[in-house]
């Protein structure tokens, strides 16, 4: 969530004419992230987030916006898109699609503990099940076809050793994706980017017995229909990792995965290919971070992520595959 497209006070005043949200009290850009232009918007009616979509088209956007509405209606805490005066959920700002959504309660937890991982695991499983009857389909746009396109553009900027790893893992994942086992894995709408900065936590009520409460998941604009296990792997690779080495923290990983499977038990096929999917989750973000680092787009507040972080994670997952916690598996 960076700022690629500037919005002046005059721009905002014209845009807000299409909403019944009262008067603007405060408006500022959000400097984190790398994909869209995002702004905190406070009005006399409440707190919101304005997003200008830098890459998604108006034809692609309904999948994401409608998915958030669908999940919210099924009790999953996500930002709710705000309707414009004509009933639509997004419009056009500076020639690009744009939308306003409600702002979730809480703050990001950048040093998550066991309790945070339990909350995330349970809600991720609930989100997957809630999306089963979502009628629209949009593939994960940062999956194998995109990797195949991006890798040749990255190769000139990296070392021979990195190239060997990048191309070798691409071949491994291509074979995995082509397998009957992969085709049989459960699938549906996935967040595909559920990092620790894409969830918020608030203080739990005193009578709950918990110290934290999940405020919700946000930034669904990398979402797509994919294998649920991929979504779990992406989440574990961020929430349950030692940031200095890339190794999994066994306690946090076990907590998140056990919490997930209390809601949706893993299948036998998912257990068999957990290691492959952990590698896929690491590879996806190594490729995208290499691409964004070496082939950046102009942005007023862009802060590119370190590609080396996910290179370390990928090497760790290749060396230490790990296993899902033991419990009864579905077929």
From Swiss-Prot:
Major enzyme class: transferase
Family classification: Belongs to the pseudomonas-type ThrB family.
Keywords: Amino-acid biosynthesis, ATP-binding, Kinase, Nucleotide-binding, Threonine biosynthesis, Transferase
GO biological process entries: threonine biosynthetic process
Pathway: Amino-acid biosynthesis; L-threonine biosynthesis; L-threonine from L-aspartate: step 4/5
Record InterPro entries: Aminoglycoside_PTrfase, Homoserine_kinase_II, Kinase-like_dom_sf, Pseudomonas-type_ThrB
Name of the molecule in the record: Homoserine kinase
Primary gene name: thrB
Gene Ontology terms, MF aspect: ATP binding; homoserine kinase activity
Catalyses which reaction(s): L-homoserine + ATP = O-phospho-L-homoserine + ADP + H(+)
Entry EC no(s): 2.7.1.39
Coiled coil ranges: none
SUPFAM superfamilies found in the cross-reference section: Protein kinase-like (PK-like) (SSF56112)
């Amino acid at each position: 969530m960076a700022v690629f497209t500037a919005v002046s006070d005059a721009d905002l005043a014209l845009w807000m004419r299409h909403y019944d949200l009262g008067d603007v009290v405060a408006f500022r850009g959000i400097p984190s992230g790398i994909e869209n232009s995002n702004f905190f918007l406070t009005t006399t009616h409440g707190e919101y987030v304005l997003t200008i979509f830098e890459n998604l088209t108006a034809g692609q956007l309904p999948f994401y916006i409608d998915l958030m509405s669908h999940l919210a209606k099924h009790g999953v805490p996500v930002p709710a898109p705000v309707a414009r005066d004509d009933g639509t959920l997004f419009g056009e700002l500076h020639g690009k699609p744009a939308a306003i959504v409600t702002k979730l309660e809480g703050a990001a937890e950048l040093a998550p503990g066991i309790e945070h991982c339990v909350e995330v695991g349970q809600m991720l499983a609930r989100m997957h099940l809630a999306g089963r009857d979502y009628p629209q389909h949009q593939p994960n746009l940062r999956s194998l076809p995109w990797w195949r396109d991006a890798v040749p553009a990255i190769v000139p900027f990296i070392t021979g050793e990195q190239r060997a790893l990048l191309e070798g893992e691409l071949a491994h994942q291509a074979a995995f994706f082509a397998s009957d086992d992969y085709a049989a894995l459960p699938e549906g709408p996935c967040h595909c980017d559920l990092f620790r900065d894409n969830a918020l936590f608030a203080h739990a009520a005193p009578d709950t017995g918990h110290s934290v409460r999940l405020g919700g998941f946000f930034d669904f604009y990398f979402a797509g229909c994919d294998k649920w296990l991929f979504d779990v792997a992406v989440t574990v690779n961020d929430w349950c990792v030692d940031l200095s080495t890339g190794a999994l923290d066994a306690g946090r990983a076990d907590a998140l995965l056990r919490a997930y499977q209390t809601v949706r038990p893993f299948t036998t096929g998912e257990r068999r290919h957990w290691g492959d999917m952990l590698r896929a989750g690491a590879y996806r973000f190594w490729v995208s971070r290499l691409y964004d680092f070496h082939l950046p787009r102009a942005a007023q507040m862009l802060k590119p992520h370190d590609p080396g972080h996910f290179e370390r994670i990928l090497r760790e997952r290749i060396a230490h595959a790990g296993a899902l916690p033991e419990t009864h598996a579905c077929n």
